[in-house]
Each structure stands twice: as C-alpha cells, then as structure tokens.
Curated annotation (Swiss-Prot):
This is tRNA(Met) cytidine acetate ligase. Belongs to the TmcAL family. ATP binds at residues 7-20, 101, 153, 178-179. It comes from Lactobacillus acidophilus (strain ATCC 700396 / NCK56 / N2 / NCFM). It is an enzyme of class 6 (ligase). It catalyses: cytidine(34) in elongator tRNA(Met) + acetate + ATP = N(4)-acetylcytidine(34) in elongator tRNA(Met) + AMP + diphosphate. NCBIfam families: PRK13670.1. Signal peptide: none annotated. Its main location: cytoplasm. GO terms for molecular function: ATP binding; ligase activity, forming carbon-nitrogen bonds; tRNA binding. One of its GO terms (cellular component) is cytoplasm. InterPro entries: Rossmann-like_a/b/a_fold (IPR014729), tRNA(Met)_cyd_acetate_ligase (IPR008513).
Length: 383
C-alpha cells in the first residue's frame, strides 16, 4: 500500500486546506493521506493559534488518514531545513507522493528543484551584507531559472523540490493551484476562503467570530470561538524579556542560531523595546529577515541550544496525533517497512531523550499559556 503526503501547519485549518485535502484524495484514490503537521510552534517562529490536538482532529475530519507531529527541530527552521526534514520523514513513512498548494501549478517543480539544488554548491558565500541571505539567494534563483519566483507558496514548493532532489527524489511531486486569499492579514469581503493569517489576525484583535463557520470546519470554528486565549508574541514578550535580562551573554551565546553578536544586541535593546514588534525592529538589520529573528527569539524564550537541536535531529521520532481506520490499516500493513520510530504515548522514559524530550520541554510553555496538557495523558485521536 502506497500513500500520499501533505506537509502542513493548519494554523488554523481553513477552506483552502480542505480543498488541498480533497485534491490529495483524488490523487490518492483508495490509498491513505498522511499529514506531517507542525506541533504547537510553527515555522515563522510563533506559537500556533490552537493546540496540535485540535488541529489534528480538524485534519482527520477533513479527510486525512494519519496525522503525525513534525518534530520541533524540523518545524521551527528556515524553509530549506523545514523541507528537508519533512520530506525525509515522509519517505521513511513509506509515502510515495507529495501534494502541495502553489500559486502556479504549471511550474515544473521537479526540474526547477534539480536546477536550484546546484546553486549552494556554486555560491556558498554571499558577500553583500546590505541584503539578507534570502534576498541574495532568491536573486540567484531568478538568475539560474530565468524568472523571478517570489510568491510564498511557490518559494516553499521549490524548497520541497530541492530537498526532494537532494534526498534522491523519493517522492513524486504534485503541485496544486491554491484557492482563496493570499497570505496577507486582511479578510476578504467576498468568498469563503480566507487566509490563515487573516483568521489569526481576526482572533488576536478580538473581532466577531460568527463567520468562522463559513471559513473552516464547523467543529474547529466552535473550538476557536470558545477558546479563551489566542497565543501571540505580545502575550509572550514579558517572558522573553525576563529570559534575556536574566541570562548571561555566555548563556545567550549557546542559543541555537545565535550568531555575530546578536546576543549583545538583544541584551541592549530588550530594555528599550515596549513590545515584541518594537524589539524586532530594534534588532533588525539587512542581514536578517524578520522570520529569522522571530525564530531566534523563540529559541531564546524556550532556551533551545545548539546541542538540543542536534540531539533532537539525530534522534528524531514521530508523535502520532491521530488516525482513521484506513490509517490504522496502513500502519499495520507497513510496520516492517517504516523506517522511523512512531510514538503514540508519551511516558517518562520516552520524554527524556531525542526529539520527544525537546517537544515535551518546549510544550510546557504552551501548556502554561493554554492550560491544557499536550503530551502526558494524551492518546492519538481516532475517527
């Protein structure tokens, strides 16, 4: 039995994601749909708007057959490492095809991925410090492939393609034209497909939630409407401020991705910034994107060191969040062929090492904010 994979955050899951799952079903036919979903922290360096369990349940109710949690050491990384870790894990799960949404599905992602994969070997050292690495990299991509690719889903799709090429192309790529709004924070006046960013923005600003049921599964909409806390950086900023102010320079230097004196800059500016947005502006330079600095701030808040990430990455396992009857059958039939450890229950032993140890530790802050246990005592959702 083969399987079709989706890499997702579902933060939150909305009508556009339901469309993608439906397209995946057309490709999978009778085979299962396997989702690798980021947990309680997402790639842009933030807490997810709702728990991984609620988002996994929404995915299962929308057509997924298996939902696994992407380890923190892959989920909170730049696009290249995010893609590499996710595709590697999908391949180890026996997934044969990858479905992903893009702005233009006519692009030959497999071909472009093979072309772009050669760029880092030829251009390892980007010297223009007046621009971010990502800006220079995107310019090099445009030069190599003959046209600019600057739409967010296309950029991520290319990262998938490059990672897939570098891993020996274990997955067949199926780009699907995405529907609905772009990635901006503004709700569209017409149409039922809103962006996840716009939905999060509505929730964080305390606006009317009565229309949520038109933009996402009703059960998920009800959970979000009743949720008392919506995690965001303004809520977390006092904790970050305490962490930076109470840490020594040596402690900060051990934080993952802390480089080029940023520990001094963070120490200096945290006293002056009134909120997280101002703090980011104060430490921002042309060498670093806001996404990179948000991730660094998250690593700092959670005290995630280089050693933590290395240990997690070298001992990755996958937490099973939920399954359907078809998903259970797939795991049973392919047990001997699956090349990664699957964990369905967190206990004291499994929580002490590898990716699960980092997951349990980082989830403690989410538990404090949301007031709901995320690991101990939880069992995979069955639909």
């Amino acid at each position: 039995m083969s399987a079709v994979g989706i890499i997702a955050e579902f933060n939150p899951l909305h009508s556009g994601h339901e469309f993608l799952l439906n397209q995946a079903r057309l490709i999978a036919k009778k085979d299962p749909i396997v989702v690798l979903m980021s947990g309680n922290y997402v790639q842009r360096g933030e807490m997810a708007i709702m728990s991984k369990w609620d988002r996994a349940k929404a995915a299962l109710q929308s057509g997924a057959d298996l939902v696994f949690e992407t380890p923190f050491s892959t989920a909170v990384e730049p696009a290249d490492l995010f893609s590499l870790g996710n595709i590697d894990q999908l391949a180890k799960l026996g997934v044969t095809d990858l479905v992903f949404g893009v702005e233009d599905a006519n692009l030959n992602f497999a071909y472009l991925g093979s072309r772009i994969a050669e760029i880092p070997q030829n251009h390892m050292d980007f010297k223009d410090y007046s621009q971010t690495y990502s800006t220079q990299y995107n310019q090099m991509v445009a030069h190599e492939v003959g046209h600019e690719i600057n739409q967010p889903n296309a950029i991520l799709g290319l990262a998938y393609a490059v990672a897939n090429h570098n891993l020996g192309s274990p997955l067949k790529l199926h780009p699907v034209n995405r529907i609905g709004a772009g990635h901006d924070d503004i709700l569209q006046r017409s149409g039922v497909v809103q962006s996840a960013s716009a939905i999060r923005n509505l929730l964080l600003h305390g606006e009317d939630t009565s229309n949520l049921k038109y933009w996402m599964p009703k059960n998920e909409a009800n959970i979000l409407a009743k949720q008392k806390v919506y995690p965001n950086w303004n809520l977390l900023y006092p904790f970050l401020k305490y962490r930076i102010e109470s840490s020594s320079i040596e402690d900060l230097r051990r934080i993952y991705q802390m480089s080029e004196g940023l520990e001094y800059k963070m120490k200096q500016e945290i006293h002056l910034a009134r909120d997280f947005t101002e703090f980011l502006r104060r430490i921002k330079s042309k060498r670093y994107t806001y996404a990179r600095l948000r991730r660094l701030s998250l690593y700092t808040l959670l005290n995630v060191t280089y050693d933590d990430m290395l240990d997690s990455f070298n001992h990755e396992s996958l937490m099973l969040l939920g399954f359907s009857k078809k998903g259970r059958q797939y795991l049973k039939q392919n047990r001997k062929n699956i090349q990664t450890e699957i964990i369905s229950k967190v206990d004291k032993r499994s929580a002490k090492s590898g990716s699960l140890a980092l997951q349990v530790r980082t989830d403690r802050l989410f538990e404090q904010v949301m007031g709901v246990d995320q690991n101990f005592g939880q069992r995979p959702i069955e639909v």
